[in-house]
Amino acid sequence: MAACGAEERQRTGRLSALSVYRRAAGPGRLERRRRGTPLPAGGKRTKARLRRGAAGGGGPERAAPPQGAAVSDRVERAGSSEAKQGDLKTNPSGPPAKAPAGNLETKSPGGPLTTSVGPRAKAPAGSPEAKPPGDPATSPGGGGVPGLLRRLGRLEDSRRRAAELFRWLVAPAAPEEFARQHWERAPLLVQRGDPGYYAGLFSTADFDAILRSGDVHFGTHLDVTSYAEGVRETHNPVGRALPAVVWDFYQNGCSLRLLSPQAFSTTVWHFLSILQEHFGSMAGANTYLTPPGTQGFAPHYDDIEAFVLQLEGKKHWRVYGPRTSSEALPQFSSANLTQAELGEPLLEVVLEAGDLLYFPRGFIHQADCLPDAHSLHITVSSYQRNSWGDFLEKLLPAALQMALEEDLEYRQGLPMDCLGYMGVANSDAVDARRTAFVEKVQHLIKKLVDYAPIDAAMDQRAKSFLHDCLPPVLTQSEKQLSVYGFPARWQDGGPRNVDIQITKDTEVRLLHHGVVRLCNEEAGVMLYYTTENSRVYHKEEPKYLEIDPEYTDSIEFLLSSYPNHVSVDTLPCDALEDKISLATLLFEKGILTTKKPLVQV
């Protein structure tokens, strides 16, 4: 508040910090609208600078946490737009013009790389097409997304739950078609004409409730952003994000990005915890709330596969293909780009509530709000650093280490005179010694494949994935049949129902298919698991049990038997005592469930 003089500070000394901000910055956007006076250009940025105590711009973009943003500056960014009948065109100098109500306008060059899927045609009542078998989106029960998740919970196999949830996500496009034509290749646009499709997943009411009841802090959980006149700024103050401050930022034209909503919303947590099993890679999310007629982010591309779910209002999107082959499927997100660096959009569309837009990593995108509606969307992201190259980064050093230990040829010395004929300065020289040297390197590289511990490297990648994972959300039945529903309690002055009575006849199975991973490590055999993970990304260290090698066959037996139950007596351990001990240990960690509730003695 350096802008306030001593007299002003004395006059406002008893006012709240928010009142001081308002006095320093002048009336807010809403008050100006009531007075009928225009909002001065750049007003919201001046106010935001006062809040964060900085005189200049927003500074470098803060890296968002991997779980929430496997989406760093993801999913918005725009120049202004002007919507006309039959097309959406860009007007870089003025605010967005109003689009015709209810009109979903798409601009696309066509061709095989961009597909727009309209709403599912209504099938005749009673026909097989009316309710495809196994399609939870069309099964009876309603209840929006929470109802969908409950119905998925009736499926015994967690892999089927994940597959059916993904089918619902991209419907009416078929998952097989999506994998063949779009995944890592091209955007997919689904215009459903169904504003209630995502009902119950997340809403502005949820956003407000989180601000009021959650421990939300600027920068850690919430970003306040703007993008105007080619300038992208972050306006985060220090400290807790209180509703009065946050909503005043919004009133003054700033976008709000809630990082990792799964840490606050049980429904989003449940949604992502199922979906991550489909991808076999961490599934993260951010939510974006944007005021009418504004945008919060500059054009850019990301290092994740992005699924944009339009929850409320509408938003104008432009998506551009990678500019060069090196930008296709990038390892890292780009810096903010300028409008001058962009070509013609591959896809231009207004998303309305219930619509879906998918685009692969490396596809540049930007989005702005039309003046007649706010926008709330959630971006679900996955496949960050999950490429062949990322796998080889871990595999090849291990292969080389094994080759050095086991093969004399890798330990033999280099030729004494190789410095004289190798190197860039000698690259054009015609020399038989150079030819022999290159051939030797090629031979050793090819031979390295024989030492590559491919399965062990994949186990380590799976271990990393399990650390990234959200903990599973249990159905009511799973709770009753697991340690989480075990009736141990304090009663009549002492603990009751404490003993876990697992016998040789108890039938058990893994909680979910991907809940554990066996890894052979130098320290021993480790069983990594997800049931004790945090909803906050990497808040806890990886969870594992050190397993006696004689138990590995039993773990593999449980993995291969899923989703079927097996009796404890069938576990391939030498002694019955070992079978019961292992089953009890896994039950206590929430890894195993029983077919029937355990009987209390």
Curated annotation (Swiss-Prot):
Record flagged with keyword Zinc-finger: no
Cofactor(s) the protein requires to work: Fe(2+)
Keyword Repressor part of the UniProt annotation: yes
Enzyme Commission number(s) from the entry: 1.14.11.27, 1.14.11.79
Compartment annotation: Nucleus, Nucleolus; Nucleus, Nucleoplasm
Catalysed reaction, written as an equation: N(6),N(6)-dimethyl-L-lysyl(36)-[histone H3] + 2 2-oxoglutarate + 2 O2 = L-lysyl(36)-[histone H3] + 2 formaldehyde + 2 succinate + 2 CO2; N(6)-methyl-L-lysyl-[protein] + 2-oxoglutarate + O2 = L-lysyl-[protein] + formaldehyde + succinate + CO2; L-histidyl-[protein] + 2-oxoglutarate + O2 = (3S)-3-hydroxy-L-histidyl-[protein] + succinate + CO2
One GO MF term: histone H3K4me/H3K4me2/H3K4me3 demethylase activity
Feature: compositional bias, Basic and acidic residues: 1-11, 73-87
Cofactor annotation remark: Binds 1 Fe(2+) ion per subunit.
GO BP terms in the entry: negative regulation of DNA-templated transcription; negative regulation of osteoblast differentiation
Superkingdom: Eukaryota
Coiled-coil intervals: none
Keyword terms: Chromatin regulator, Dioxygenase, Iron, Metal-binding, Nucleus, Oxidoreductase, Repressor, Transcription, Transcription regulation
Region (Disordered): 1-149
Biased composition (Low complexity): 61-70
Annotated binding of Fe cation, by residue: 300, 302, 365
Every JmjC domain range: 254-399
General function of this protein: Oxygenase that can act as both a histone lysine demethylase and a ribosomal histidine hydroxylase. Specifically demethylates 'Lys-4' (H3K4me) and 'Lys-36' (H3K36me) of histone H3, thereby playing a central role in histone code. Preferentially demethylates trimethylated H3 'Lys-4' (H3K4me3) and monomethylated H3 'Lys-4' (H3K4me1) residues, while it has weaker activity for dimethylated H3 'Lys-36' (H3K36me2). Also catalyzes demethylation of non-histone proteins. Also catalyzes the hydroxylation of 60S ribosomal protein L8 on 'His-216', thereby playing a role in ribosome biogenesis.
PANTHER family, per the entry: MINA53 MYC INDUCED NUCLEAR ANTIGEN (PTHR13096), RIBOSOMAL OXYGENASE 1 (PTHR13096:SF8)
Protein name stated in the entry: Ribosomal oxygenase 1
Species of provenance: Gallus gallus
Gene: RIOX1
